[in-house]
A protein has these predicted regions:
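A cross-domain feature marking catalytic cores of carbohydrate-active enzymes
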Residues: 11-15, 51-58, 84-91, 137-141, ...
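Active-site groove signature of glycoside hydrolases
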Residues: 118-150, 171-182, 315-316
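N-terminal pre-domain/capping segments
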Residues: 1-131, 162, 169, 243, ...
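Active-site cleft segment of glycoside hydrolase catalytic domains centered on the general acid/base Glu
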Residues: 143-161, 167-168
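Glycine/Thr-rich phosphate-binding loops of Rossmann-like dinucleotide-binding domains
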Residues: 62, 145, 269
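A short helix->loop->beta-strand "cap" motif at the edges of active sites that frequently abuts
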Residues: 82, 130-131, 173, 305-312
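Histidine-acidic metal/acid-base catalytic patches
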Residues: 1-44, 126, 158-159, 186-350
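Surface-exposed cleft-lining segments at the edges of enzyme active sites
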Residues: 102-105, 142-152, 177-184, 226-237, ...
């Protein structure tokens, strides 16, 4: 442990790789107990995961299960000496939610799921297992559908998110929107900033930065007009890459209140019911375009190099891997090792 003196930010795993891209004709989901056991078993130089983030949806969680369901989740965490961090709203159509840019019925479904999730989040705090973390939301619409009326749809999403902020404030929570190339209105760095500014609830709504998804922002995959790198970019030109990455993070870092350590090989991928989005790679993938500790620093430090300390935990995100890979202990040790490297470089003692 003396080689890794920093204890903040706390290091979390994500439980949802056992769900995202699973089912719907693909591989079956991996149950929550298995994901938590794998998380608790990982260890690097005496360092272990401190907690996990979770998507509050079947089969990992029943959002309509009442406080008893929340108590069961708290018990699962406590039994493994893990904390709960950020919780993800099941706001998608098909998970009980609706489109934020849709009509009144859709918006009410979405906001209803936000309310349920914020209640669970607050209860987990009261139960003593969730000292940090936010509530994550998405626009949950395709870029194609959003593009039919960009101005009108962006306004409706902003209006719905503003109402979601009121719900979060009533529960003592903050919301974070995760920009991904597959979510309309949040599919480029410029549109993401635009949406956050339109909502104009900076104290309550922020950005969740995922290192994999934001890499695709640089490439302008679904928004070529917002690309910061050309299509024929030479990935060996590290200086030019870092210049573009600095521009990206300068725009989004002031909004960032939640962070995903991740790797990407510069391509997109989708499986199961999940649309194509930035391909998550394993932490040790030789095709990965990111120097994880180096590029994490663009998010965790300001332009002068000072730590922002804008969030108290980091979460790994790596989805749509084969179940056989997810069940290997070495997978999680490698991931934890990458996260320890980030904390060694950009963490602090607290």
């Amino acid at each position: 442990m003396s080689d890794h003196p920093n204890n903040y930010p706390k290091l979390h795993n994500a439980a949802w790789p056992g769900l995202v891209g699973k089912g719907d004709g693909g591989e079956p989901p991996i149950d929550l107990d298995t994901m938590l056991d794998l998380t608790a078993a990982a260890e690097v130089d005496g360092v272990k995961f401190d907690g996990f983030d979770i998507f509050l949806y079947h089969p990992h969680f029943n959002i309509d299960g009442g406080d008893e369901e929340t108590k069961r989740l708290a018990e699962k965490a406590r039994a493994r000496n893990l904390q709960v961090g950020t919780v993800v709203v099941p706001g998608y159509p098909g998970t009980g939610g609706g489109l934020p840019m849709g009509g009144k019925a859709d918006q009410e479904k979405f906001l209803g799921q936000v309310h349920k999730t914020c209640h669970v989040a607050r209860k987990l705090r009261e139960l003593g297992v969730r000292p940090h973390g936010v509530v994550r939301i998405d626009s949950v619409c395709s870029v194609e559908a959003w593009s039919e009326d960009p101005k009108g749809n962006q306004k409706r999403i902003a209006d719905t998110f503003r109402e979601a902020c009121k719900i979060a404030e009533d529960h003592g929570e903050r919301l974070a929107a995760e920009g991904e190339i597959c979510w309309g209105g949040m599919h480029s760095w410029r549109r993401m900033v635009e949406l956050l500014e339109m909502v104009d609830c900076r104290e309550t709504l922020g950005f969740q930065a995922d290192m994999s998804h934001t890499l695709l922002f640089l490439m302008g995959y679904n928004a070529p007009e917002d690309a910061l790198l050309p299509q024929d970019f030479d990935w060996n030109d590290h200086e030019r890459f870092d210049e573009a990455y600095a521009k990206l993070t300068t725009a989004l870092r002031p909004w960032t209140i939640d962070f995903h350590v991740a790797q990407n090989d510069g391509t997109v991928y989708g499986s199961g019911s999940h649309d194509k989005t930035g391909r998550h790679c394993l932490a040790t993938d030789p095709k990965g375009k990111l120097d994880i500790p180096h590029h994490a620093g663009f998010w965790l430090r300001d332009e002068s190099g000072r730590l922002t300390k804008a969030f108290r935990h980091l979460c790994w995100d790596g989805c749509m891997f084969p179940n056989a890979t997810l069940r290997k202990r070495d997978t999680w040790n490698d991931i934890l090792g990458a996260m320890v490297g980030v904390r060694d470089a950009h963490g602090w003692k607290g």
